[in-house]
Amino acid sequence: MGVNAVHWFRKGLRLHDNPALKECIQGADTIRCVYILDPWFAGSSNVGINRWRFLLQCLEDLDANLRKLNSRLFVIRGQPADVFPRLFKEWNITKLSIEYDSEPFGKERDAAIKKLATEAGVEVIVRISHTLYDLDKIIELNGGQPPLTYKRFQTLISKMEPLEIPVETITSEVIEKCTTPLSDDHDEKYGVPSLEELGFDTDGLSSAVWPGGETEALTRLERHLERKAWVANFERPRMNANSLLASPTGLSPYLRFGCLSCRLFYFKLTDLYKKVKRNSSPPLSLYGQLLWREFFYTAATNNPRFDKMEGNPICVQIPWDKNPEALAKWAEGRTGFPWIDAIMTQLRQEGWIHHLARHAVACFLTRGDLWISWEEGMKVFEELLLDADWSINAGSWMWLSCSSFFQQFFHCYCPVGFGRRTDPNGDYIRRYLPVLRGFPAKYIYDPWNAPEGIQKVAKCLIGINYPKPMVNHAEASRLNIERMKQIYQQLSRYRGLGLLASVPSNPNGNGGFMGYSTENIPGCSSSGSCSQGSGILHYTHGDSQQTHLLKQGRSSMGTGLSGGKRPSQEEDTQSIGPKVQRQSTN
């Protein structure tokens, strides 16, 4: 009997730097590449149409690239635990390869499949390629616990062995005599389905701003590196209006779905830096997004409650308000704050928003204005963000809501001033909220302050054509900062830790925030400085402030455990949430 191999694609939707697939092909007589899709999840899971479209485009591109190698992608409907025993028998499989999945549900799923494979006499190959590092080794280096500060994480990885270089791309030379058995009805039995076949209504669906697939990912990588090359000092680009728009060099969804290897990106960045800087060693900051990605993956890998507040040992238990009406206004871009609403509109239409825009809407929903749980925001991002995955989405929301990782809760974004500073003319607002297009720049971020005559000329009456602000930012932010302060004081007493040492002695000052023109902004003083809760966040990652979170479990604020929801199948198979990196790939 020959060696019949199957490679199971989940994330890692690519032929470059795919060590599990490469090893699976070696010595095999036949190879079949499969992707298991449960159509039931398309209608029931919390995943929007833009994300499903991106996934299907990734699968179509993968199939097209396999065709060039006289192979095909086999898209199989069903559940892995039901599908594989049948395939093992039907195809006489002797070898199965998979990319290692670090997320708790993925590890549980893969353990079950490995057991089925062993019982069927099938060899299983598992290789790490969705992350740069072996996360278990990072945790081992840290005494068996994940590092909960970025500084500590950087210290740990600096002690690890150099990264392995990407493996060669799967080509006809790599495949050699390994063939793929194909039938005439392959498309009918194993073809990539359409959105319509999955039950989606595509009427009015605009063309994709982010086309899915490995081919697009590699094209974007070259553009991204060309852009980097002229930024000889590799500093962070300055934020401006154009930064808010989707870029043809953006990479985050492609890293998320594994269309682009993080290792390839890492080594391309390294090579470029050495070329520009004449062989000097690159700083860790060069790899901003990649390392933040690893940081959150490491924090989440052994914590199945990472996406929950209750029962999550690293999450502060905060008594958030339940307010479905306010949540819907935020999610649908109806808050009455044009900056917030434009961001949420872009997210719903295109599936992507700039990482600082993510910070702004996350702060507004949680500790800044609405006092709604980060879990609710995380679910909306899970539905709409192309680059949202389980670990990074949950980790980012905990971080931005001051529920974990740092506690500078007295720093907030002003939902008027931050946008005005970024895009003074308001072009971004006009693009995504055309109802406000007629307002002059002076009033486009706070149209409720425009005289009635200007509103009439703009053909937009506030409260009729566009909503009034749903909250008074000044009052809400002051109240919420006080709430946070009380929670952390209680937690400090409960754990016997001095967590509030960094709270400014003058909480009504602007605390060194960037200044905005703040006249007549709800929540900002007329003196020209942002009031409490109205500035830019300052990020700190002091180790001493984090130690209690490792052991906390349930604080005195907790209310017990709640049942976990199984991730959707689409979420299982691909898994960057709100961007928190110092250097963006967008």
Curated annotation (Swiss-Prot):
Q: Where is the composition biased (Polar residues)?
A: 545-559
Localization:
Cytoplasm; Nucleus
> Motif (LIR 2) spans which residues?
82-87
Motif LIR 8 covers 379-384
Region of interest: Interaction with TIMELESS = 471-493
Give UniProt keywords alphabetically: Biological rhythms, Chromophore, Cytoplasm, FAD, Flavoprotein, Isopeptide bond, Nucleotide-binding, Nucleus, Phosphoprotein, Photoreceptor protein, Receptor, Repressor, Sensory transduction, Transcription, Transcription regulation, Ubl conjugation
Which co-factors does it depend on?
Answer: FAD; (6R)-5,10-methylene-5,6,7,8-tetrahydrofolate
Mention any one GO cellular component term assigned to this protein in its UniProt record: nucleus
Q: Where is this region: Required for inhibition of CLOCK-BMAL1-mediated transcription?
A: 371-470
From the record heading this protein, give the residue positions of the covalent cross-link Glycyl lysine isopeptide (Lys-Gly) (interchain with G-Cter in ubiquitin): 11, 107, 159, 329, 485, 565
Q: How is the cofactor bound?
A: Binds 1 FAD per subunit. Only a minority of the protein molecules contain bound FAD. Contrary to the situation in photolyases, the FAD is bound in a shallow, surface-exposed pocket. Binds 1 5,10-methenyltetrahydrofolate (MTHF) non-covalently per subunit.
Which segment of this protein is annotated as the motif LIR 3?
Answer: 151-156
Assembly and interaction partners: Component of the circadian core oscillator, which includes the CRY proteins, CLOCK or NPAS2, BMAL1 or BMAL2, CSNK1D and/or CSNK1E, TIMELESS, and the PER proteins. Interacts directly with TIMELESS. Interacts directly with PER1, PER2 and PER3; interaction with PER2 inhibits its ubiquitination and vice versa. Interacts with FBXL21. Interacts with FBXL3. Interacts with CLOCK-BMAL1 independently of PER2 and DNA. Interacts with HDAC1, HDAC2 and SIN3B. Interacts with nuclear receptors AR, NR1D1, NR3C1/GR, RORA and RORC; the interaction with at least NR3C1/GR is ligand dependent.
Q: Which family does it belong to?
A: Belongs to the DNA photolyase class-1 family.
Name assigned to this protein: Cryptochrome-1
- Write the gene name: CRY1
